[in-house]
Structures are given as structure tokens and as C-alpha cells.
């Protein structure tokens, strides 16, 4: 089963380093205070958001059919669905909905809410909809395939047979959160199914309800007294926008915040030797990547793509900027999952890059605009690449800022960021990096990094990815993923992966039960404080 392959990447392996004492904390015992960077938060609609910071908030405002506990995310557990069955042909999943669950509005949660929510995700067609659309659900068929048969039963019928765990993992993702359909019907504006309302409000049944959110300032969530698993210990959670690492560190050391989430490697290293702090490092399923737009006649040259792989300072970054934020990984499936290759064939080699550029017809290099997210560690990695590229004759005009929209619309030359695939399975990564069924601009497959990069993925690779997702025999599936890994690496893909994503957080020793989560579902209702 997938479970045995996921142990290395389960959030249970969060690494904690306990350290000596600092000033006494000042945050109230019944409140949790988080320091984050809100610059990428564009709203709180679970069927629209696609960022780590928003996802953690959504994970606590809403519930899902399936629970993926941090201690072992490889084994799906009952959530809003207290039980489920899978038909003999593997295509029909029948979920029994838990009774007694209330939304924050006071409305009871029923199978009709589940039906409406999953249909809404598909019909909105935004980036998170890929999580269901990849299994064959469309706006045209979803009403037939996802249906409530009574007040406590929901049937999810897949058009084709897929590995059952893929469907269950999907229904545990934050994108498949269940919304209060009756309440949102009152908030509908022009048929938007409550989308405008949910930018700054919630309609969930999770352990916390949203009190207020001021963008790039402060979010406040209150414990939900009628939460079906019991009222949380933390009466309130405050999420503060503190973009500077040094400011996060000072407030954590001074006891003004309990958790700091975007610290530089320098500040994390200092905390290792100087404070009463725990450093959590949670390996995830995403990558730090460099995207080379294949619409560009220069960047679409395979030798140019290969040259970029020799301009990343893997070793230097591993010991500095990426010490807390990534694990060197140049192949497409992370360690611990079936199909992972035990090899990292590239190293920083400017002369090799020059040779490849000459063979490609660019002995004097070229100039390109390079967009990078201006947060740690992404920007430091981008600056390193810019310096190494210059040595090979490539002039990169590095521009910080929020350019994710340009990436999604394929309006860029070079772009780098980090991804966070949400299923503990190779398919989650391969779906984004190695499938692109329609490479036209009109296809708008914005949830796929391969489409965003305008890469016409070789048919051989795409066919194997599809076959592996359908395969129910785990041994055969692992063999297929090994072949995919080799073929992907040999193709010199325009998505240059360098480090497996690791999420690093610094947590006050007063805080217990705050657990990093590989799929961004960190829960606040498990938290207590000394």
C-alpha cells in the first residue's frame, strides 16, 4: 500500500530541535499567536486558494470527508465521513456522513452540503479544481457523478477506475473542504456561489470560525464551541502579518508570538544556539523549481534547459540558504515514495553550462527577465542562480514581486518559486509536472506547472503517468513510477527541480501539539500551552 512508501515523508518525521532558555513568554495561555507572511494570501475561499498560509487557515475553518492526521498522513481516517465503502469495480465510493455536525452558522451539516460543495469546486474551475478534475469530473458530469442519496449518504462515482487511495487522499485535501450551502445561498451574488463573500469570511464547520481578517495585517479566529470533536483549548488564534524574518525572530524571542513561519536560515541558525525554541522541519511533496517558458525559442532548446541544471549551486545552497528549507533532490519523485531515484546527477559546473550553450548555438549567452518570489529562501536561491548564470554569459534581469499571475498565464520568460503538491502519492507531483493534455493557451490548465511552462510533455511520459494512476497493484505501480522518473530526467524538462520542499517553523517551547503537516493541514485544535 501507499502507506509503507510514505513513512519517510509523513509529517510524523517532523524534526524538532529543543534549545536553551530566553525571556519569558507573554502571549496568553489560551491564545495562539502565529507570525506569517500574508503577501500571497488572496482570499479564504477553499475552492480558490492555493497558498500555504491560506491553506493552514482554511484547514481550521473547514472540515473534509477524510482526515489526514499529521502523525500518519499515509493512512486516510474518518473525518466528516464516519465510514465509507468502495464498490467491487473500484468506481463508486459511498460515504456515510457523520451526524450532529454543525456549521458556524448553526445549520446542521448534511449530505446535501457535501454534494453542493464538491460540485461547486468543479464548477468554479479555479486552480484547486484540478484536484477533482484530474479524475474525470467536469462541470457537465459532476451533478450526475457526485450526489446525495439521502441526508446522510453521498455517492462519488469516478468515470474511470483509479487507485482508491488517490480518491481518498483527494477528499482529505483542503481544496475539497465542505461549505454551508444553505448559508452561502443567501450570500450569492450573480451566481458566484458565495465566492465574493468567502474572500474575507467563512462558511465552515471547523474547530475555528473567522472573526476578522485585515489583509496584510491581522487575522483573528475564535474557537467554535459547538465543534463536533469538542471545543479547542485555544480560545483564539491570532495570525499576524510580519514579513521580515528579523522581526519575526525578535517577537518570538520576546514572547510576543508563539510560532514564526518565515525565518531566514540565518535567523533559524541563531535560534538553534540561543533560545527556548523548537525548530520544526517538515518535508513536503513539492519542490523548489525554475520554470523556463517553452514558448521562448531559446529556452525551448533542450541543451539550454540542460545548461540551467549546471548553474544551480546545490552544495553551497544546501549548507546555507536551504539548510532548513530544502533537501537536495533533482529527480521528480521524493524519497520515500514509490519510484524515487537514489541519484542527484547534477552539480554546479559553469564550464559544462557554457559548453551546452555553445552546442545550442549561444556561445555568448543571452538575456532574459527572471521573476522570483521576494521571500526567503526563494529570492536568495534566485540571486545565486543569477550570479552563476552571469559567469556563463546569461544575463538574468531579476525582478521580485508577486508574479504568480504571469506564471499562470504563461506570460513570463523565467520564473522560480516552490510548489506544494497535496497528496502523499507520486501522482500528485507528476500530475502537475509531467502531464499537459492540451498545450494551447485556450486550454487554461492553470493548475499544472507543465501547462504554465508551455511544455508539451512527451506522450510516452504522460501515458505512463496515467497508467500508474489507474494501476491498483502496488508493485506494478512502483515499477511504472521508476520508469517515469528515468524518462522524466532524460527529457531535460523545463521545470528545473533542485530541492525537495521543507517547511521550517520556529515554535515556542510553551506550545504543545502544533505539528507541521506535509500537505499544509496543520491543526490548531490540537494545541495546548504551558
Each model region followed by its residue ranges:
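Structural transition elements
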Residues: 22, 293, 323, 327-359, ...
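N-terminal lobe/hinge region of extracytoplasmic solute-binding protein
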Residues: 35-88, 119, 201-207
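A structural "hinge/loop" feature
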Residues: 38-55, 80, 107, 131, ...
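Detector for C-terminal structural segments
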Residues: 56, 214, 218, 311-339, ...
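Gly/Pro-rich hinge or "lid" segments in bacterial periplasmic/extracellular proteins
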Residues: 69-71, 170-232, 236, 351, ...
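Aromatic- and charge-enriched surface segment that lines or borders ligand/interaction sites
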Residues: 82-128, 149, 155-157, 165, ...
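Surface-exposed binding/hinge segments that line
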Residues: 96, 133-187
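Ligand-site clamp/hinge motif
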Residues: 196, 224-270, 395
